[in-house]
From Swiss-Prot:
Belongs to the bacterial/plant glucose-1-phosphate adenylyltransferase family. It comes from Aliivibrio fischeri (strain MJ11). Pathway: Glycan biosynthesis; glycogen biosynthesis. This is Glucose-1-phosphate adenylyltransferase. Its EC number is 2.7.7.27. GO terms for biological process: glycogen biosynthetic process. Homotetramer. It comes from the Bacteria. The keyword Transferase applies. PANTHER family: GLUCOSE-1-PHOSPHATE ADENYLYLTRANSFERASE, GLUCOSE-1-PHOSPHATE ADENYLYLTRANSFERASE-RELATED. The keyword Iron-sulfur does not apply.
Length: 405
């Protein structure tokens, strides 16, 4: 789409997702067996024919670079690019100090591409969004800035920017991560929150970034600094995400923040529901990613019993023998020996599980090897002595770990 530049913020450290982010940036964390978190933001752009995209990285970005090189290479197509951009300290010897600073340090890309509008989106949420519809709203309102927003229970809104709007969709109030979020008038218990997705008129964006960069007391963040300064000037509008329609889908919009181990696990369980609120199978809104050349998954009975796969996703290259898999997601090359019982668990790929293992509500990172007869998630008090266990009782096995040997 001419006149539009996409910039995706993909530098998140993801400290609340540890140990999954010990060796990778948050947007590179695998999801849904076949994908990485970054894929959902990229698909929202590509499916909307927005094909000039810079992906701004910072922490532990090598696996993200490799994934994008293999799965998102559009080089050779005139005026189309999806380019990862490492932090380069272009404006001084410092890393990005906030979301606005990340864009400011790369303002030269905006100047050189000369877009009319700049779409700045995050990369660590699970959702589908036709950005064209938000862009149409932005243009209709002739806004300097449009912020996408959704409704959520006020009790859960303190981790987000909370918005107030008038009857025309104009922003009249904004508070970043308030301790006591304001509810929508007439909707007790419900708050309107920012999704962290912005469309700027390019000239206004550059003006605000340059002004903010000169302020010593600024945290150089869109939510903390840029939006609170801009909305009183009267040209900031709010796009209601619930009005966004995806071709080929009839369900209500789905959006999930996967910033914690619990929410990451819950989002996977959403995929496995009988009427899943988030579908991976809409041919009219395909979810592109890098898919390695692997043989189909293989299921075989064994002397210990028949293989049972119930309400689960199993990726290519996997081999499961005489075991029971229920409500679980198994990534590429999952190797499950016989007589195992795995439920409500997530295996991120290239995982080996020995004979007779029991896994309950476990996340196993790539390359882990679990010894025969190991039980994880059955006795949480014992698990806490050996593994990372979240407050909600989700056990996480780190990347490459050898367990039970």
């Amino acid at each position: 789409m001419a006149g539009v530049l996409g910039m995706i913020l993909a530098g998140g450290e993801g400290s609340r997702l540890r140990p999954l982010t010990e060796s990778r940036t948050k947007p590179a964390v695998p999801f849904g067996g076949s994908y990485r978190l970054i894929d959902f933001a990229l698909n929202n752009f590509v499916n909307a024919d927005l094909m000039r995209i810079y992906v701004l990285t910072q922490f532990k970005s090598q696996s993200l670079f490799q994934h994008m090189k293999k799965g998102w290479n559009v080089n050779g197509i005139t005026d189309r690019f999806i380019d990862p951009v490492p932090a380069q300290m272009r404006t001084g010897k410092r890393w990005y100090e906030g979301t606005a600073d990340a864009i400011y340090q790369n303002i030269s890309f905006i100047e050189s591409t000369d877009p009319e509008h700049v779409c700045i989106f995050g990369s660590d949420h699970i959702y589908k969004m036709d950005i064209r519809q938000m862009l149409d709203f932005h243009k209709k309102k002739k806004a300097a800035l449009t912020v996408s927003a959704l409704r959520m229970p006020a009790k859960d809104a303190s981790g987000f920017g909370v918005i107030e709007v008038d009857e025309h969709g104009k922003m009249i109030g904004f508070e970043e991560k308030p301790s006591n979020p304001k509810c929508i008038p007439g909707q007790p218990g419900i708050a309107l929150v920012s999704m962290g997705n912005y469309i700027f008129e390019a000239e206004s964006l550059c003006k605000e970034l340059i002004h903010d960069a000169a302020l010593e007391d600024s945290s150089h963040d869109f939510g903390k600094d840029i939006i609170p300064k801009m909305f009183p000037e009267g040209n900031v509008y709010v796009y209601d995400f619930s009005t966004n329609h995806i071709t080929g889908e009839k369900k209500e919009v789905y959006w999930r923040d996967v910033g914690t181990i619990e929410s990451y696990w819950e989002a996977h369980m959403d995929l496995l529901k009988k009427d899943a609120p988030f579908s991976l199978y809409n041919r009219k809104w395909p979810l592109h990613t890098y898919y390695p050349p692997l043989p189909p998954a293989t299921f075989s009975d064994s002397d210990n019993g028949r293989v049972q796969i119930i309400d689960s996703l199993v990726c290519g290259g996997s081999y499961i023998r005489g075991s029971r898999i229920e409500k679980s997601v198994l990534g590429f090359r999952s190797n499950i020996a016989s007589a195992c019982d795995i439920s409500e668990s997530i295996l991120l790929g290239n995982v080996k599980v020995g004979k007779g293992c029991v896994l309950r509500r476990v996340i196993v990172d790539k390359g882990a090897d679990i010894a025969p007869g190991t039980e994880i998630g059955v006795n949480l008090q014992e698990d806490k002595k050996k593994y990372h266990v979240s407050d909600e009782g989700i056990v996480v096995i780190p990347k490459g770990e050898r367990v039970g040997y």
